[in-house]
Curated annotation (Swiss-Prot):
NCBIfam families: cobA_cysG_Cterm, cysG_Nterm, PRK06136.1, PRK10637.1. NAD(+) binds at D22, V23, L43, T44. It comes from Salmonella agona (strain SL483). Pfam families: CysG_dimeriser, NAD_binding_7, Sirohm_synth_M, TP_methylase. S-adenosyl-L-methionine binds at P225, G301, G302, D303, I306, T331, A332, M382, G411. Keywords: Cobalamin biosynthesis, Lyase, Methyltransferase, Multifunctional enzyme, NAD, Oxidoreductase, Phosphoprotein, Porphyrin biosynthesis, S-adenosyl-L-methionine, Transferase. CDD domains: SUMT. Its EC number is 2.1.1.107, 1.3.1.76, 4.99.1.4. InterPro entries: 4pyrrol_Mease, 4pyrrol_Methylase_sf, 4pyrrole_Mease_sub1, 4pyrrole_Mease_sub2, CobA/CysG_C, NAD(P)-bd_dom_sf, Siro_Cobalamin_biosynth, Sirohaem_synt_dimer_dom_sf. In the N-terminal section; belongs to the precorrin-2 dehydrogenase / sirohydrochlorin ferrochelatase family. This is Siroheme synthase. Residues 1-204 are annotated as: Precorrin-2 dehydrogenase /sirohydrochlorin ferrochelatase. The gene is cysG.
Length: 459
């Protein structure tokens, strides 16, 4: 993060703008809306500045840049069409430890101005860090269309109720549950928009009188294979409403950055053959936190019901009578194959797909005869340590030695790497790859060179 997003309280505080043209006028309008006590210093001014000055809204200082005007300032903006003057303003502000924005020169500035969606008191700011103002503007326009105009009225009314909510609901969890009901109540929002005081009061009293659900719950959420863009909308909603998130090592940092900031986080990372936290202990963590009345999200890489042991965790909750739900995720087989240019099915090469675990319980054995059959694609999860055995068994049960294979490491992420070859090389190829990785076996792998669209490394 190159810039810390903050909201400044500028009401009745001295601010300076250097420049008297159209750009300076736009910046002045923002500072005036924020209640700043504004001085504008320039050689000449467009008419709007004179109008504001005559109305007593700001002070004009005509002439060259006077750095003594900064002495009482909290914040400054350099908005002239002269780069040399703008740099002088920036240097003078820097020497006084005053934050200064330099229009169209983010590297010379100590702060940048975001694109703003104003639903006061709700404010949304969008910034590209000065690298792409057009992108920030396009995002602002999209958000403008998504956020109702009356949202500010809802936020303002919520502020009026805060003391009552704090008095009536003793815990943070209860208050959060109340506010979640409050902000999704369409009737209340519409009544506020219509200025229907009677309906607003009736809906408010109903919200306060309805009992809150104090029962805890567990939501099993599939985080997908790595790319945060592959997290489902419902999954995103759940991690942003969680009291506590229990997650494993296959959940990417980008996805964890989307988790509600105030949520507790419990890492229970596991590797094939080694459990940082035993599965039974994970089950008990989910049970214990839900019994405290918390909204628990169990966040798993891929899909929780495909080699994620999600069923085992839910059985424990079911036995204890804890409410639960499941949000599916994109499983690694689907995500990694797509990002590697390998279709899992193809009319000419594969009429079926088998998802296989390469990490068996002691003494376990796969149905190698059926796995070696023609016209199918095999995807092995957690198979790196068994790659040589997979190679040996498939060949022994009749699979052709030149069957294409691929190993996908860190699939769908910026660190994705794919190595490929033929079945007789599988054990050797596995030595070049680190976990997490997926093994794909089948004629469809041969299409990779043609269909590969996502590549960060040359294989």
């Amino acid at each position: 993060m190159d810039h810390l997003p903050i909201f400044c309280q500028l009401r009745d505080r001295d601010c300076l703008i250097v420049g008297g043209g159209d750009v300076a006028e736009r910046k002045a309008r923002l500072l005036l809306e924020a209640g700043a006590r504004l001085t504008v210093n320039a050689l000449t001014f467009i008419p709007q500045f004179t109008v504001w000055a005559n109305e007593g809204m700001l002070t004009l200082v005509e002439g060259p840049f006077d750095e003594t005007l900064l002495d009482s300032c909290w914040l400054a903006i350099a908005a002239t069409d002269d780069d040399t003057v703008n740099q002088r303003v920036s240097d003078a502000a820097e020497s006084r430890r005053i934050f200064c924005n330099v229009v169209d020169a983010p590297k010379a500035a100590s702060f940048i101005m975001p694109s703003i969606i104003d639903r006061s008191p709700l404010m949304v700011a969008v910034s590209s860090g000065g690298t792409s103002p057009v992108l920030a503007r396009l995002l602002r326009e999209k958000l403008e269309s998504l956020l109702p105009q009356h949202l500010g009225q809802v936020a303002r009314y919520a502020g009026q109720l805060r003391a009552r909510v704090k008095k009536q609901f003793a815990t943070m969890g209860e208050r959060r549950r109340f506010w979640e009901k409050f902000f999704v109540n369409d009737r209340l929002a519409q009544s506020l928009a219509n200025a229907d005081e009677k309906a607003v009061n009736a809906t408010t009293e109903r919200l306060f009188s309805e009992p809150l659900d104090h029962r805890g719950e567990v939501v099993l959420v599939g985080a997908g294979p790595g790319d945060a863009g592959l997290l489902t909308l419902k999954g995103l909603q759940q991690i942003q409403q969680a009291d506590i998130v229990v997650y494993d090592r296959l959940v990417s940092d980008d996805i964890m950055n989307l988790v509600r900031r105030d949520a507790d986080r419990v890492f229970v990372g596991k590797r094939a053959g080694y459990h940082c936290v035993p599965q039974e202990e994970i089950n008990q963590i989910l049970l214990r936190e839900a019994q405290k009345g918390k909204r628990v999200v169990r966040l798993k890489g891929g899909d929780p019901f495909i080699f994620g042991r999600g069923g085992e965790e839910l059985e424990t909750l079911c036995h204890a009578g804890i409410p639960f739900s499941v949000v599916p995720g994109i499983t690694a087989a689907s995500g990694c194959s797509a990002y590697s240019g390998i279709p899992l099915t193809h009319r000419d090469y594969a009429q079926s797909v088998r998802l296989v675990t390469g990490h068996l319980k002691t003494g376990g054995e796969l149905d190698w005869e059926n796995l070696a059959a023609e016209k199918q694609t095999l995807v092995f999860y957690m198979g790196l340590n068994q790659a040589a055995t997979i190679q040996e068994k498939l060949i022994a049960f009749g699979m052709q030695a030149d069957m294409p294979v691929a190993l996908v490491e860190n699939g769908t992420s910026v660190k994705q790497r794919v190595v490929h070859g033929v079945l007789t090389q599988l054990g050797e190829l596995a030595q070049q790859v680190e976990s997490p990785a997926l093994i794909i076996v089948g004629r469809v792998v041969g299409l990779r060179d043609k269909l590969n669209w996502f590549s960060n490394y040359y294989d």
